Amino acid sequence: MPEAGFQATNAFTECKFTCTSGKCLYLGSLVCNQQNDCGDNSDEENCLLVTEHPPPGIFNSELEFAQIIIIVVVVTVMVVVIVCLLNHYKVSTRSFINRPNQSRRREDGLPQEGCLWPSDSAAPRLGASEIMHAPRSRDRFTAPSFIQRDRFSRFQPTYPYVQHEIDLPPTISLSDGEEPPPYQGPCTLQLRDPEQQMELNRESVRAPPNRTIFDSDLIDIAMYSGGPCPPSSNSGISASTCSSNGRMEGPPPTYSEVMGHHPGASFLHHQRSNAHRGSRLQFQQNNAESTIVPIKGKDRKPGNLV
């Protein structure tokens, strides 16, 4: 019995594997069991069928480093987002608060800086370069120029605009019964004195179609100009046709037809008729024996000679 107990004790105390460090492994199952039982991993070096693995402490350190990097990145992104949101809300709130103050300051500054369109009773009308509004120096830093124009356009009147840019024809006051002349632009428009206008109105009176009157003025004008006969200076004279011997036939044309075909003939005719009338009176005084002069007036009849 004592011998059997001694053998069992030797079996448990017998060294099965001696590590490189001198440590003894009493169990054979501790060798090549994928665990570092020796402490220097010498019990796993000569294992042919089992792949060597690093100690588990290396994996734990790498995992902790990756977790630290991820946490730092997430915290940094959150801080940046929060700062951007706070800055945005701060700027929008400041602009919302300053907008009523700016509009009120602009309304108060309009009568102080000068009205864009002053009334005639307050001051004489300024030129185009003097009525432009110059913004205040402090407004240049509040908003860009296009935003200032957009905001300031609400206070500008829609009319009147700069009046030298509006090209309108001149206004002519006509009396009752007058026919306005055909407008052909400011270059060809001619204003007449009252005497010429009354004479032109008498010339435009339409005569009976069966009357034929000799007119020495028309003969002289036709021979001088060589063109179509202008309207007669006598009441009831036809100017539609003119023969070589000075006989006028047919109804006279209307004023609009004459002015449409010959816009400058009326004014030229008045000058020439006045010149011929003066020369005719002088010739009548010199040769008062047998001069034929047509009589103007309401009592004149065809064939009355002086």
Curated annotation (Swiss-Prot):
GO terms (BP aspect)? negative regulation of cell migration; negative regulation of epithelial to mesenchymal transition; negative regulation of SMAD protein signal transduction; negative regulation of transforming growth factor beta receptor signaling pathway
Taken from the UniProt record, the cysteine pairs bridged by disulfide bonds within this chain are C19-C38, C32-C47
Q: Which residues lie on this side of the membrane: Cytoplasmic?
A: 86-306
Q: Which residues lie on this side of the membrane: Lumenal?
A: 1-64
Q: Signal peptide span per the entry? A: none
Q: Domain LDL-receptor class A spans what residues? A: 16-48
GO MF term set = R-SMAD binding
Spans through the membrane: 65-85
Instruction: Pinpoint motif PPxY motif 2 by residue range.
Output: 252-255
InterPro entries, sorted: LDL_receptor-like_sf, LDLR_class-A_CS, LDrepeatLR_classA_rpt, TMEPAI/LRAD4
Tell me where in or outside the cell this protein is found.
Answer: Early endosome membrane
Q: Name one GO cellular component term.
A: intracellular membrane-bounded organelle
**What is the tissue localization of expression for this protein?**
Expressed in lymphocytes.
Query: What keyword terms does UniProt attach to this protein?
Result: Disulfide bond, Endosome, Membrane, Signal transduction inhibitor, Transmembrane, Transmembrane helix
Give the residue ranges of motif SMAD interaction motif (SIM): 208-211
What biological function has been recorded for the protein in this entry?
A: Functions as a negative regulator of TGF-beta signaling and thereby probably plays a role in cell proliferation, differentiation, apoptosis, motility, extracellular matrix production and immunosuppression. In the canonical TGF-beta pathway, ZFYVE9/SARA recruits the intracellular signal transducer and transcriptional modulators SMAD2 and SMAD3 to the TGF-beta receptor. Phosphorylated by the receptor, SMAD2 and SMAD3 then form a heteromeric complex with SMAD4 that translocates to the nucleus to regulate transcription.
Q: What is this protein called?
A: Low-density lipoprotein receptor class A domain-containing protein 4
Species of the source: Homo sapiens (Human)
